[in-house]
Amino acid sequence: MFEAFIYNISVIVAGIYLFHRLQYSENKRMVFSKAYVTVLMTIVSLLLSVYPIPYREDYLIHLTFVPLLFLGRFTNMVYTLSATVIVAIVEIVVFNNSIMYGVTLIVIAAVTSAIGPFLKQNDVLSLLILNVVTIIILFGVALVSPIYTLSEVIILIPISLIITLASAITFVDIWHFFSLVNRYENEDKYDYLTGLGNVKEFDRHLNEISRKAEKEHQSIALLLIDIDGFKDVNDTYSHKSGDAVLKQMSQLLKNYVPNQFKIFRNGGEEFSVVIHNYSLDQSVKLAENIRSGVEKSSFHLPNKEVIKLSVSIGVGYLTDDDPKSQRKVFKDADDMVHVAKNQGRNKVMFNPIINL
């Protein structure tokens, strides 16, 4: 029994590590993949089917449902049920388990995937809650079906809780570790909070676009976007609320800025967009769309409060005939941001000084 217990824990932990390792090697940027976690946890569940934990001569403790709890938490019902159907078929056809056992697995998958993604607790506690839900389902099955007895389900409780807890802690710990590695390797280019390019990458990119525009006789424009009254958000609510606002602002900018242009967080509450081969009119219209979009949007804070914000935007612009000076286009945009602030905020300003 002890050997089987160790095997079950080892298989789950190894599967969790393999998921993170393959994910990191494949993407380098640790983008969470539901497909990856589904494939890996399905394989882990099948491996657990091979070596159930023996308890007495006539009873085996099956822990194939434990990896399915991870699917219920981290994916959705489609992924979870798809994996569970595969596991159930293998259990019935290959390992001669009853059809009722397969149906029980599917019921567990349906229930846990219906509630798992919506649990507000941290991941470890959420997985333990899903384990308790599973035990309740198994108690119900024991009352109506002979595949379990109440005493067998009771024996399952401590074993499943220990394995679920160990697996959950391992999953979260390895995820945090690889996330820190990814952050360290990319901190020279990316802002860790928003995922946008940072100020170093902004300087490199603006310099590169300036050289390209000079060579190909293209125009360049720079939008500097500053959140109005952002300090008040931090002071009134919390820095955590400020971080939430910055994340939502970065997503809003992605929704408005065309894919061919790059967005950066320059630091604090300032963002920038580098534009090339656009007319001044097109650049100003893009800035106005962003300003208007922010004004109409609601920003949700961690304490459930909703606030309204505005931005001041300065536009720096060099025509296709102008010498392409990185310093000049930045200074023009920066000057216009200050003009927008001084004239009441929530404005788009460009040179010559005209506000929209």
Curated annotation (Swiss-Prot):
GO annotation, biological process: cell adhesion involved in single-species biofilm formation; cell wall organization; negative regulation of bacterial-type flagellum-dependent cell motility
Under PROSITE patterns, the record lists: GGDEF
Main location class: membrane
Q: Identify the keywords attached in UniProt to this record, alphabetized.
A: Cell membrane, Membrane, Transmembrane, Transmembrane helix
Residue stretches making up the GGDEF domain: 218-353
Question: Which terms in the Gene Ontology molecular function aspect does this entry carry?
Answer: diguanylate cyclase activity; phosphorelay sensor kinase activity
Write out the annotated subcellular location: Cell membrane
Instruction: Tell me which GO cellular component terms the UniProt record holds.
Output: plasma membrane
Q: How does it sit in the membrane?
A: Multi-pass membrane protein
> Membrane-spanning residues where?
2-22, 35-55, 74-94, 99-119, 124-144, 154-174
Tell me which InterPro entries the record gives: Diguanylate_Cyclase, GGDEF_dom, Nucleotide_cyclase, Rev_trsase/Diguanyl_cyclase, Sig_transdc_His_kinase_LytS_TM
Xref: NCBIfam families: GGDEF (TIGR00254)
User: What name appears for this protein in its UniProt entry?
Assistant: Uncharacterized membrane protein SAOUHSC_00760
